[in-house]
């Protein structure tokens, strides 16, 4: 690759091109893969708060709930059931396993076919859940939903990061998280409506309607173009060049094309990406692929979102009121995500992480204190509606803090930091860790709520402190940096630079590496530009 590196304010090459309608349409369609994940997060908590659903599949939980309401017994423990938590969390265990297979499909067949497979599998799972006659049928449907989520979550963030121009990658990639939040909101609204259906079969409608977002991504994937990166990696170089011209809206694509080809040639030297990802030079990316999804789940957000109706019911809301409160948090989630879309490529990833972490910590402390002051350790109390509404207000503020920080960035940053040779393997690790800890926390939340009481909110708050400090010291800024040049960011970081040798950097023939020591990990334009 000839020529030096011309660096813009974000620290990477500014390739010619613009945001074309073709790219915008492709990214919107691909981002709908987030709908299936979001819909499931929202729908599962809603149906588990519907009495007809509990009576049919989890009668012991229903009896415990009724006894708690009549006898003023411990509100913290009335939903504690291993079978109920297995219903919710089985999806995430299936998604964890599926993501490893999705890595191979995504690399060999292309990103779009991985999305298509995820949509079709999710569609079958939705049909099975809607027609469920027993718990086994219900959980089998959840497993198929999980396979669909594993494939979609593995392929969609990669697709968005590869299609988007570097300077707009954050905005377009966050479309995935936006679709997750829209899916959650739609599920909350549907639950609110189906709970009113007479005859007690509204839960079937809620579960079966998961087929709608599944059909959207399955059909939409058929019309999506492959990314230039994927085409080059699979040997279709002429098609890749034509596609790159189309997605960038210019004929001046030679420099970017040559960089993509060089990255692909480098990747083909790696015969075993799963083994190579353990090499010292990939230590920074591997650490982030594990730490970021781990921390994302330890914010406690999925606990709030898919147990929101159950949580609000525990706080004393009636059935309809608890579902409406979940709708309110869903609305906050959607609108706050737009804040991230607008600011992520201007303010950068680090600032949003740090601000969101501070906001979530404050809200966790307030919510835990309010619940503790009223319920104490006994879990027995009547909460006035005004008091409960005050709790919901701070939960909404917490959701907003997550929605413009750890929510979208937890998917964006891991998808943009891996070089092509280990990108699919790296994204699989990211998704697998995310699903593993979603499963663990979903499985553990109701028992933990029963045993830790209001202290549980302080538990998650402590993790928010840890993850915010981790970002402050160890996450470099990656805005505006082309994916193929991300190694420069790690090489220039005060800590991660020690893991990367000069010979591990293959960006340009005339690149002069900056000295490690920049805490933010930003590449100094004065040192990199010729």
Swiss-Prot record:
Record keywords, A-Z: Cell membrane, Membrane, Sugar transport, Symport, Transmembrane, Transmembrane helix, Transport
| Membrane topology annotation | Multi-pass membrane protein
* Keyword Cell membrane recorded: yes
Compartments reported by the entry: Cell membrane
Work out whether the entry's keyword set contains Membrane: yes
User: Entry's PANTHER family?
Assistant: SOLUTE CARRIER FAMILY 2, FACILITATED GLUCOSE TRANSPORTER, SUGAR TRANSPORT PROTEIN MST6
Give the record's family classification. Answer: Belongs to the major facilitator superfamily. Sugar transporter (TC 2.A.1.1) family.
Q: What does this protein do?
A: Mediates active uptake of hexoses by sugar:proton symport. Can transport glucose, fructose, mannose, galactose, xylose and ribose.
Q: What is this protein called?
A: Sugar transport protein MST6
Query: What is the species listed in this Swiss-Prot or TrEMBL entry?
Result: Oryza sativa subsp. japonica (Rice)
The top of its lineage is: Eukaryota, Viridiplantae, Streptophyta, Embryophyta, Tracheophyta
């Amino acid at each position: 690759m000839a020529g030096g590196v011309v660096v813009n304010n974000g620290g990477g090459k500014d390739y010619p091109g613009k945001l074309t309608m073709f790219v915008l349409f492709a990214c919107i369609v691909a981002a709908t893969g987030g709908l299936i994940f979001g819909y499931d997060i929202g729908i599962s908590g809603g149906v588990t708060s519907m009495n007809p659903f509990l009576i049919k599949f989890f009668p012991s939980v229903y009896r415990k709930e009724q006894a708690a309401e009549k006898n003023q017994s411990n509100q913290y423990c009335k939903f504690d059931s291993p079978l109920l938590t297995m219903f919710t969390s089985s999806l995430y265990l299936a998604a964890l396993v599926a993501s490893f297979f999705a890595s191979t499909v995504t690399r060999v067949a292309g990103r779009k076919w991985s999305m298509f497979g995820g949509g079709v599998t999710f569609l079958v799972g939705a049909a099975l859940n809607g027609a469920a006659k027993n718990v086994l049928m219900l959980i089998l449907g959840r497993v198929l939903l999980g396979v669909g989520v594993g494939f979609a979550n593995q392929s969609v963030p990669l697709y968005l990061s590869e299609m988007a121009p570097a300077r707009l990658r954050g905005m377009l990639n966050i479309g995935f998280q936006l679709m997750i939040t829209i899916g959650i909101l739609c599920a909350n609204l549907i639950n609110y409506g189906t709970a009113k259906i007479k005859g007690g079969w509204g839960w079937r409608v809620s579960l079966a309607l998961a087929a709608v977002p599944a059909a959207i991504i399955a059909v939409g994937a058929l019309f999506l173009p492959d990314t230039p990166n994927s085409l080059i990696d699979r040997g279709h170089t002429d098609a890749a060049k034509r596609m790159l011209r189309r997605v960038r809206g210019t004929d001046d694509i030679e420099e970017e094309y040559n960089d993509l080809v060089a990255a692909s040639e480098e990747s083909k030297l790696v015969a075993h990406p799963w083994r190579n990802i353990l090499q010292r030079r990939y230590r920074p990316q591997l650490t982030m692929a594990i730490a970021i999804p781990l921390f994302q789940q330890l914010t406690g957000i999925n606990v709030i979102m898919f147990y929101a109706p159950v949580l609000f019911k525990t706080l004393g809301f009636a059935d309809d009121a608890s579902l409406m409160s979940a709708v309110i948090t869903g609305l906050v989630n959607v609108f706050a995500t737009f804040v991230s879309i607008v600011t992520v490529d201007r303010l950068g990833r680090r600032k949003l992480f740090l601000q969101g972490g501070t906001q979530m910590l404050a809200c966790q402390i307030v919510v835990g204190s309010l619940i503790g002051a009223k319920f104490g350790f006994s879990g027995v109390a009547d909460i006035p509606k005004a008091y409960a509404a005050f709790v919901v207000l701070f939960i909404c503020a917490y959701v907003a803090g997550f929605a413009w920080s750890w929510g979208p960035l937890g998917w964006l940053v891991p998808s943009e930091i891996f070089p092509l040779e280990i990108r699919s393997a790296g994204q699989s690790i990211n998704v697998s860790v995310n699903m593993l800890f979603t499963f663990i926390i979903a499985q553990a939340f109701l028992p933990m709520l029963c045993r830790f009481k209001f202290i549980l909110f302080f538990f998650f708050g402590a993790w928010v402190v840890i993850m915010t400090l981790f970002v402050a010291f160890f996450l470099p800024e990656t805005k505006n940096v082309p994916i193929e040049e991300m190694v420069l960011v790690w090489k220039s970081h005060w800590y991660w630079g020690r893991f990367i040798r000069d010979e591990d950097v293959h960006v340009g023939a005339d690149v002069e590496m900056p000295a490690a020591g920049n805490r933010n990990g930003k590449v100094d334009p004065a040192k990199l530009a010729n």
